Design a protein with these regions (language model features):
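Short catalytic/ligand-binding loop motif for oxyanion handling, primarily in non-cytosolic enzymes
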Residues: 54-56, 103-105, 111-113, 179, ...
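Mid-domain catalytic core of redox enzymes
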Residues: 39, 240-364
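N-terminal Rossmann-like FAD-binding beta1-loop-alpha1 element of flavoenzymes
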Residues: 20-46
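Active-site/ligand-binding neighborhood in enzyme catalytic cores
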Residues: 109-110, 114-258
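C-terminal catalytic lobe of FAD-dependent flavoproteins
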Residues: 344-409
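Dinucleotide-binding Rossmann-like beta1-alpha1 core, especially the glycine-rich loop
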Residues: 64-139
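Glycine-rich FAD pyrophosphate-binding loop
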Residues: 37-61
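Extreme N-terminal leader/targeting segments of oxidoreductases
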Residues: 1-20, 38-41
Length: 409
């Protein structure tokens, strides 16, 4: 049995042997744990509150044998050669030859998103589209990525008309469903994630590498955590194990001198004493259909002007599964996270007020010289898988070797 599949029980006296404790077994925790164990010689304990590893990337076969992503679709995409090579140690890949492509259902019509020159030619007649294409290239340059809010500022009436179409049919209602806010209220970092592309590129991402692990994300995480120096404990809240006292962290009543890498929700670590950090959560509705296809070969369809859900994912097109019996889809319904049982904080709602609240919690951690915050929950920010992997690798590199490793050199 792989170490990652075990729920281990260990004698109290052995707990003080660990050089590092990693809280959370998602991409952040698993990467830093592997690096500390392998490169720094640390004995690492990974504590995971859920009953499985892999964080929100966790996948599993459903009752019909179709591999599904339990917490919504996750796709690895990157231009970082070092990150791609690192994760390739633990998985082979199904790389998308033509990139990951997404379409929007606009009143029953499917158009490529991000909005690009192909989309332009779909909604305008040939002559008008050619003239508008020339204007867009002249204003922004061929191949550029223009955030919708910036496009709306262009004084040219024809470009404004394009911007208004995109705003109303691609961004506005979808954004309000996803975030519970208008685009004007949302951080530019968020609205800039899906720009208007001045190109004929239908790919949702423009990264060199795009795809999913060949045998699933879970298998990749199992291999990452399968190391003689790593112990994995699932189904445990870290607060059952660690006590945070003034200026020191206790491990079952004894001061812990090693590193604690925390990847969970920072406000919940402190029992939300200043109030909850606002997040958007998601409700997922899985459905299996006794038919070969539901979305005409599209893995993801965004519903930008209709429906209460934001998108539908058809998993067999995401994972390229060939032996699927029927097809399984998932609908996503966003809502405001309240901290109730079963709710999961997915997306930090970034604005100055929420950042100030986060900084209050972060200040509480400064008394612990051996506590490190890592990940989208601990840092209250958005990360793609590649950026999170890179950050975890850098953190591991910055930490010292364990004492026994130093003595061997």
């Amino acid at each position: 049995m792989h170490a990652a599949e075990q729920k281990l029980q260990f004698p109290l006296q052995q707990k003080v042997m660990y050089d590092s404790i990693v809280i959370g077994a998602g991409i952040a925790g698993s990467t830093v744990a592997r690096q500390l164990a392998e490169k720094k010689g640390h004995k690492v304990l990974v504590v995971e509150k859920r009953d499985h590893i892999g964080g929100n990337c966790y996948d599993r076969p459903d009752d019909y044998g179709i591999l599904v992503h339990e917490y919504g679709p996750h796709i690895f995409h990157t231009n970082m050669e070092d990150v791609f090579m690192y994760l390739s140690r633990f998985t082979e890949w199904i790389l998308y030859e033509n990139g990951h492509q997404v379409v929007a259902n606009v009143d029953g019509r499917l158009i490529p998103i991000p909005f690009n020159l192909n989309t332009l030619h779909m909604i305008y007649d040939k002559e008008t589209a050619a003239a508008l294409e020339k204007k867009l290239i002249g204003a922004y340059g061929e191949g550029s990525r223009v955030p919708i809010m910036k496009l709306r500022e262009n004084p040219d009436p024809q470009i404004q008309a394009i911007a208004q179409y995109v705003y109303e049919n691609v961004f506005l209602k979808y954004t309000m469903k996803q975030w519970g806010q208008t685009p004007e209220e949302i951080s530019p970092e968020v609205t800039g994630r899906v720009p208007v592309l001045i190109s004929y590129d239908n790919r949702y991402f423009q990264d060199k590498y795009q795809g999913v692990p060949k045998h699933g994300f879970l298998e990749m995480f199992v291999r990452m955590l399968d190391h003689e120096n790593i112990t994995v404990q699932t189904g445990m809240d870290a607060r059952e194990l660690l006590q945070f006292r003034e200026n020191e962290i206790l491990l079952d009543g004894q001061k812990f001198e090693g590193n604690v890498i925390f990847t969970g929700a920072l406000d919940e670590l402190y029992d939300c004493r200043y109030g909850r950090l606002p997040y958007r959560s998601l409700r997922f509705e899985f459905e299996h259909l006794a038919q070969d296809d539901f979305q005409n070969g599209h893995s993801v369809v965004n519903y930008t002007v209709s429906e209460d859900f934001t998108r539908i994912t058809e998993f067999k097109y995401l994972t390229r599964q060939k032996d699927a019996d029927g097809t399984t889809i998932i609908r996503e319904y966003p809502f405001a996270y309240t901290g109730a049982d079963g709710e999961i904080p997915y997306y930090a709602i970034m604005n100055p007020e929420n950042e100030a609240l986060y900084q209050k919690y972060k200040k509480l951690t400064q008394q612990y010289s051996n506590l490190y915050l890592l990940g989208r929950l601990a840092e209250y920010k958005y990360y793609n898988i590649d950026a999170m992997t890179k950050k975890a690798l850098e953190l591991a590199e910055s930490l010292p070797d364990c004492q026994s490793q130093k003595q061997l050199r």
